[in-house]
Amino acid sequence: MRDYQSFEVRNVSVIGHSGAGKTSVLEAMLYYTKATDRFGKTTEGSSMIDFDTEEIRRGLSVYTTIVPIEWEDSKINFIDTPGYLDFVGEKQGGFSVGDSSLIVVNAKDPLQSGTKLAYKQAVAEKKPTIFFINKLDEEHTSFDASYQALREEFGKSVIPFEVPIVEDGKIVGSVNIIKNKAWYYSPELADKPCPVPESMQEEVALYKDQIAEAVAMGDDELMEKFFSGEEFSDAELKRGVRIGVRNGEICPVYSGSAVNSIGIQRLMDLIISYFPTYSERGMYTATTPNGVKVELLTSETEVLTAQVFKTIVDPFVGRISYVKVLSGVLAADSTVVNANNGKPEKISQIYIVKGKHQTAAGKLFTGDIGALVKLQNTKTNDTLCDKGKLLMADPIVFDTPMYGQAVVPKTKNDEDRLSNGLARLQEEDPTFKVVNNPETKETVIYGIGDQHLDVIVNKLNSKFKAEVVLSDPKITYRETITKTAVGEGRHKKQSGGHGQFGHVFVEFSPNPDEEEMVFAEKVFGGAVPKQYFPAVETGLRECCQKGPLAGYKMVNVKTTLLDGKYHDVDSSEMAFKMAAHLAYKDAMTKARPILLEPIMNVKIRVPDEFTGAVIGDLNKRRGSIMGMTPVDSDQEIDAQVPMANMSRYCVELRSMTTGLGTYTMEMDRYDPVPEPYASRVIEDSKKDKE
């Protein structure tokens, strides 16, 4: 593959619902352009794109893959992204480097949740978008039904540019709306424009009017011409369509069948005709380390900025960093600087990646995508620059992992391998997080969902030889008291020689203003010498680490040393510490201790039609609805819910909302646990200690 510069490169993110055929569309392009000698299939393990063992096992994309296609003396870097929602981190990284979007739609179910999410994301990022309705050669599919569903859901910007010609239930060709010509797939008619079938002329005229109207909306001169009934010239129409597609005002619809290579050539032609090259983007904004915004040309003449959007950590090869050159030229055998941390990086070699294959390259020009190996100080979202010209690209925003599971090694031999594997996988995946909880003594791993963590567990085993077991993480309950009580503690021990003696009276009272135990003293007349006050406080703090009900930490308690006795010879710090323990034990029988549970602030965003179901489910979780705010066609629900009832919420919310609901949560406070839940927690705690 030759070098391509910014005016020859297009970067297209391929997005859509899982199973719509995104990878198959790209496999068909590879095969059609003779980049491969066979049509690869994930399920057979022959795919050039989905080649990882996890992808073969599941039969779907798990990772983002770069698929460069050479077509019409240009290079299209397709970024194949997973459609399954658990792998959204891979999708977000891949989507960020695409300058345009190709949404692949399943003709049998055109409005799947992944299609809606893909379009929503493309609109939010203002990226030119094309729809490809796939699998139209399968039974019970209809182009018209699929197109109408898309137009009704997403608006008048969705317009067909080609319509399939169907004879006896089979797609035999297509009609190009703008050119008003038909093309047939039979060998004798291939690449020969033909008249539009008479039965389709009315339909084609209607679609051409839709295109003309959309073009007119973006140009005052053409609008006047449109409403006066004049037809646009071919040049006016093509120019208007290009502008409309690039502004997001027109979303062309194409169709076909990836597995039978129907419509694939026409789709590549459409992408070349209407999607912008990287240089046509014009400018992009970078930021200096001091926070100053700088406008840069998307050109090879500009200073170098190259952003890492994906990292792979291999136990044998090391770190592989996928980069997009946003400006300037990245050269092999050069030294650059990481603008995010100021550290130098040696660029030993650059690779052009095509699925599972890599080819060495001397340079990577503006707009192009490649891979670097063994960078020492660089991670995903970092920007590589020329020395002395440090500029950072806007960071890619990744979802926060919410689904947590405690992880333990299966055997002692797995401990070191597990620790190493978790550290490496965090470098690789921005949506994977590891938290060591000192209170529960658990290591908790967080991901987007259960399938995400399933992939993590399999990678720990296959890549790092660490077998693990997952379980629900323990909830960090708390205990407190609801009544003021005085406890007496008298520690006396005589065993020959010096004995041990300490005697204290301690008041325990609720103190909602301070989480940690507060210690005070009101001792009069030297009943307890001051030198023993720290020992009493230490003893009380030790006791508060384990509450009387279930052994959870005591909070919101004020302790006051009131009185006591000492012995000139037998008293010691240890004796008074033990006396404090006994006073605590005595007081807890009278202070009415209760169990507290963590309450989470939860912010949920769902389409309107799911609001009722989500609120009903929150009520079942003992949640309180704090408010609702309309956001576009969604509702944002603010709620407070006990943490104990949120352990699998990411999976269950996805099920309730067909994948369209999202949420975030953070700790707010501790509240009393009502019965009978408190008794269950206390009973379970006792069983764990047996």
For every predicted segment, state its role.
Residues 1-690:
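Structural and coupling elements of P-loop NTPases
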